[in-house]
Amino acid sequence: MESHRYEAMAKLADDTVLEAGAGLHRPRNVDWKRAAALLYGDWGTSKAYVIGLAFVAAGFSSLPIILAVCAVTGLVGVNYIVICRHFPDGGGVYSAARSQGRLLAVVGALLLVANLTVTAALSGWAALSYITSGAEHIAWIKLLRDHIALTTTVVLLFLGAINYFGPKHSGNLAIALAMPTVIVVLILIAVSVPHLTTKFLQPRHESLSALWVQFVGVILALSGAESIANLTGVMKLDPGSTPEHPSVARESLKAIAPVAVEVVLGTALLGWAMLSLPSVMGQTLHLTSPSAVSAALEARQQDMLRLIAEQFGTVTIAPWFGSVFSWIVGIVFFFLLLSASNTAIVAMIGLLYMMTRDGEMPRQFTRLNHHGVPSWPLLIAGGLPVAVVLIAADFNALVSLYAIGVVGAITVNVGSCSFNRTVEFTWYDRLLFAVTFLILGAVEITLARTKPDALFFIICVLGGGLALRAYTLKRHGLTTLTVTREVAAMVTPDLVSTMRPQLQEGQKIMVAARGPTPVLTYALEEAQLRKATLCVLYVREIAIFYGGGPPPPVRGRWQDNPEAAAIMSMMLKLGAERGISVLPVYAVSEDTSSTILDLAATMGVDYLILGASQRSAMAKLLRGSVATNVAQQLPDSIRLIIYG
């Protein structure tokens, strides 16, 4: 009986429930320059460790491998230019593959989760390698470097703790560092070019099959492609297109093309520069034998760009310049890699939450903390990279886990596009997708065959994720909703007349509620005194980064939110007792301040009542004050009252 009454109350309240963003389009405020900077913050970090790993794999015969990695990177970039042209609302693997089947989309998303997990761990480790190299003589830095796995764990836990407050302004560090990094890379190439030589290049020593395995082992420069595909949903539209018929073909092309060119050419030139280091290491480090040079290069595989800066800077200008420039490279890439690690954590939170909103993950994953961040996805996004770092034996063990996730996700994406008949791809687009699908499919199979640790890792991620999905689907439709006796007692046959808003000509007062605080009593007294309609607004803040795609649909029913239900039920009852017309207004939003402003203006209220901020100093620093933001932008026609 209680559940039937609750359903009746829910249906009757549908007319008075508002959703933030209903009938609106997500703001498209990311221009191509910002999108390119965000893409570079992910894609541009690959050169920091790809060339060093290539040398470890094949020594002075590694240039063909580096060039092959660059070629595949360029090929994937062309694929995603086409994908972004046809998916203006988000073309990541989860969105693109969903048209071919929900299970396929979930598999693609879980492969991306595996990639983001290793990206966070690997970027954190590499960041510490870049900042601590060359300072081993300092005792505490040597301690950090000797226990780099534990140090990386602490860094990842710190990033997870920061994300407890939400992802506001996430990615700003990557944007700020994009141009300095490009400048550093250009200077690095400039001091290296005079010393480039083919003298030390060697022919391959292995069979073609062994060369293929070596190539597969260092194909680490692909994960940025998914990030730009997810950004199309918030990119500015092309001139002449509309929100109803969006197009971001030109904007996405301008964002992808320069970054792809920089990544491809920069990685190729710096790889050649690495193989030309023996020409100067005899002068700077007095190393002449091939074995000594190879040992020195292998020892610096994790921070190869610093070694290139140090050696060529010393020979080209002066020893002091080589030392200073090496530290500049280390500091810039430290922050860029740290930002990439944080971005991976944020993206994983958003991806898990989006899957949950689509009914693919347990409902518990939607539970938010006080800052609007989903608790379980935050725990998973922060915990998985830590677990991987603690389990991995060394940097190379982390590298072995990396490619299988991102290559699998991109394979699912381009494969889905090649078979997608709902999108008007040209025949040569489909041919491009098919060729890329076959190449990356072969890479994925080779990774599974030659890297058992990577295969075990991806099976664990897929197995755990699909098990959670199976549990979720089994529970759908079987969970009953239980309400308290107090709520059930309020649902009577007279509820229709009780809840129907009795709007009259006159003033309207809106009060924004976050809990059963004294501001609600004050609002009731004001409404009774002025004989005004009282609009009780409850905003459920969701601090989620969706990776650029449109936010998933959210059921905006206050009856489904226990705290909102308690407040609204109490206010309806108290309003009825005092003869006040109470109008419940429920909104789900990423930005509480903007939602309050929009609804206050839309509903034409005369007074807006807010409670004094109860946030801590740290929360205000990271997220700002709602009352302050509202006061700065509220129209003059609406009077603001801050109570408390």
Region locations from a protein language model:
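Extracellular loop-to-transmembrane helix junctions
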Residues: 51-109, 118-155, 262-266
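Selective recognition of specific alpha-helical transmembrane segments in multi-pass small-molecule
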Residues: 68-75, 179-194, 249-281
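Membrane-interface "cap" regions at the ends of multi-pass membrane proteins
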Residues: 1-50, 78, 95-97, 211-215
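Helix-loop-helix junctions that connect adjacent transmembrane segments
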Residues: 25, 175-230, 236, 272-276, ...
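Extracellular/periplasmic helix-exit of transmembrane alpha-helices
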Residues: 240-245, 257-311
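C-terminal membrane-solvent junction of multi-pass transporters and transport-like membrane proteins
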Residues: 173, 205, 364-375, 410-452
